[in-house]
Structure formats: C-alpha cells, structure tokens
Amino acid sequence: MVDYQGKKVVIIGLGLTGLSCVDFFIARGVTPRVMDTRINPPGLDQLPESVEQHVGDLNQEWLLDADLIVVSPGMALAHPALSEAAEAGVEIIGDIELFCRENQAPVVAITGSNGKSTVTTLVGEMAKAAGWSVGGGGNIGVPALTLLKQDNQLTVLELSSFQLETTHSLRASAATILNVTEDHTDRYPLGLQQYRAAKLRVYENAKVCVVNADDALTMPVRGADSRCISFGVDVGDYHLNKQQGEIWLRVRGEKVLNTREMKLSGRHNYTNALAALALADAVGIPRASSLKALTTFSGLPHRFQLVLERHGVRWINDSKATNVGSTEAALDGLQVDGTLHLLLGGDGKSADFSGLTHFLQGDRIKVYCFGRDGGQLAALRPDVSQLTETMAQAMALVAKVVLPGDRVLLSPACASLDQFRSFEHRGNEFARLAEELG
C-alpha cells in the first residue's frame, strides 16, 4: 500500500479508465487534477466539481508542478511534455501500476499482439467453471482499478504494451506473451524489438511464464528458464496433435480434449485454448473445470465470428484483426471448400504488408481491398484483387459472385478509424451487410 496523502496528482486521459483513477485517489483523500487532449472527452460530465480539469491540450504548468502523473495508455511517453516532466523528476505511471501496488489477489497477466482478449476471457471462464470468484479486465472491459473493489480469488488482466511501459510492480502468478508481430509502429519507431521489450515486462517477477514455442520473440531475454511452460502447434508442453483427421489438445503427451468438442474453430483459436489451459493449470484451476469451459466458450464478437451461414456460404467477421499478424493467424491453416473471398483494408498504421503474400496464393481466393491502404494491399496479388473505396462497395462485389461452399472473411489487417468509429463498428456493419446481401 502506498500513501498518496499530500501528493499533487495529475491524471492524463478520461474515459472509464481515467474516471477509475479519479475515484481511486478521491477515496484516498487526494483530489487530482485531470487533463485530456480531446475537447470533449468521455466522462467529462461525471467529474466531481472539486476536480480541476483542462481539455484540448496538455497543461505543461500542471505537469511540472505534479509529484505524480497517471497517464492514459493512449498517450506516448515520448511526448515532449511528458519527457520534460520526467526529466524534472516527476513520477509517471499508469493505472495498472496503481492497481498492482494495492492488489492482494493472484494475477494472471496476458499480453501479445493477437489473441489477448480471447485468452483473458477463456481463463476467466475456466475459473468461473471451478466456482471461483474472478475479476477480468485491464485492456478489455472493466478498468483494473474497478477490480480492486471486488473480493476475488483471482484477477485476470489483459495488458497492452502501452500499459506495461508504465508498470513496475506487477508480480503475476502466471504471465504470458502469446505472440509478437509488428504493430503500433507509430509508437515504436525503433521497430519490433522496442515493441517486444515493452511486452517482456510482463515476465518481471512472474512465478510462471507461459511462452509460445513457435515464436522466439515471446521468450524471456535470457531464454527459457525454470519458470517457463510452453505451448505451440506441434511442439511445446501444451500442443496440438492430429490423429485420423481429428485434432486434439495434448498436455505433455497426454490427449486432454478433442477440438470437435469445442465451439471455437481455427488453428489460432486452438493455440489460444492451449495458452489458456497452461495459465489455468499454473494457478491451480482444476483441469476438469478448464476443459468444461473450453467446450462451452463460443468466442468473442468480431474475432473470427461466424455471423451468417446461408445458401452454403459462411460469412465471418474478424474485424478485430487490426494488424498483419492477426490476419495471418486467421488465414493460417484455413480450409475452404470453395473460394475464399477476403476483405482487407483500412489504416495500416505504416505496417509492412508483405508477409500476407504467402497466404494469398492459389486460384481459390479473391481479395477485395478498401480504405486508406487498400491500394497497397491490392498490390500484393493484383491478379485476384479488386480495389474499392469502402467496405460496403467491396461486399456488393462479393455478393454478385459468391457460390455455395465459399467463405467470406473480413480480416482487414488494418485499423478501422479511417472509415469507422472502431473495429466493433466495422464488424457490426459487416454483419449487417452480410444479412442484407447474403
């Protein structure tokens, strides 16, 4: 526990997380100041009257006068105003650090470029199936500080690289980096290793590290050690096993579940299940409860979600695929009876799309590209690609040629904000248009 009495605290960034920080300090007898670069940030009208606010930009005078700055993950630490405050000796942390200083419950910490939300939710479902009281949140759903108010036996946190940058006191009972693929190049100008270094912070002081045997970038800097348990497709303590056309989850050579019994589909989801099982085992959730959860969990919206099956055509919403690695995961091992109609596009965040080319081969694929970086994506395989301005135009083209046995997959490999409010908005539009056109 840390005593914040008498500290001058500034919170940067409102919304649910910012408000949870305000509540945290007021409950401890400290009235913070709040600022947000947005003119009308969400939650502004919910601030207590006693809290000073500054919107539209950063108030440098407040920052330099502070003892402690709690910064939103959306604000880069490299911002000149924050750099100046840090050089002046002001402590800069995030809400996850505040949580870790106070939390008493065991923590499962999950990060990675792709699959975080699915694995976080799965581990929570496994704990619930065992009758445990569990709180889940962080980068998904409930702000971490809200979880402090609950008396849980286990806390499962999804953590982004941005959140980990400002966290120093995390001591996870089990932690994982699911994978590391290029993302957020705008925030990590030094490249993939800088991004990876932020992710690796999740292993600091962790009792058990769950690593991806197929991705060396998920290993601790000094390599695997006695804390490490691995999962992977063909190798790892937890791995997949194909026998007579069926795929099993195996743990150290023992078959534990036939994937036919799972509602999740796709190889990337089977490895997500392995990671969740490894984490659950590490914190003592009974195996039978975990396996039961795997047979009932049907996945999260916008993550390889079947939204329509009509006239023999399956329409799949994978709008959460906001980077190249996530789309590669969706395409890896994907089997389609007919033709795959793949929708790509949006804001690529300066990413290198060339890795997708490998997955766009063959004559049973058609690619429909839209949005800000649609042209770059269409150039990967111009002979099978069509370029439109919007996703709706692309789907109208798909509807004219789709046949029974085909699959329509929105897995854009890009952020959505060039044309949509969020990846959820994009996914909901895809589902609406599928229903209309399918």
From Swiss-Prot:
Major location category of this protein: cytoplasm
GO molecular function, one term: ATP binding
Keywords: ATP-binding, Cell cycle, Cell division, Cell shape, Cell wall biogenesis/degradation, Cytoplasm, Ligase, Nucleotide-binding, Peptidoglycan synthesis
Compartments where located: Cytoplasm
GO biological process, one term: cell division
Catalyzed reactions per annotation: UDP-N-acetyl-alpha-D-muramoyl-L-alanine + D-glutamate + ATP = UDP-N-acetyl-alpha-D-muramoyl-L-alanyl-D-glutamate + ADP + phosphate + H(+)
Source organism, top-level taxon: Bacteria
GO cellular component, one term: cytoplasm
Pathway: Cell wall biogenesis; peptidoglycan biosynthesis
E.C. designation(s): 6.3.2.9
Catalytic EC class: ligase
Binding site for ATP: 112-118
Known role: Cell wall formation. Catalyzes the addition of glutamate to the nucleotide precursor UDP-N-acetylmuramoyl-L-alanine (UMA).
Protein family according to the UniProt entry: Belongs to the MurCDEF family.
UniProt protein name: UDP-N-acetylmuramoylalanine--D-glutamate ligase
Species, as recorded: Yersinia pestis
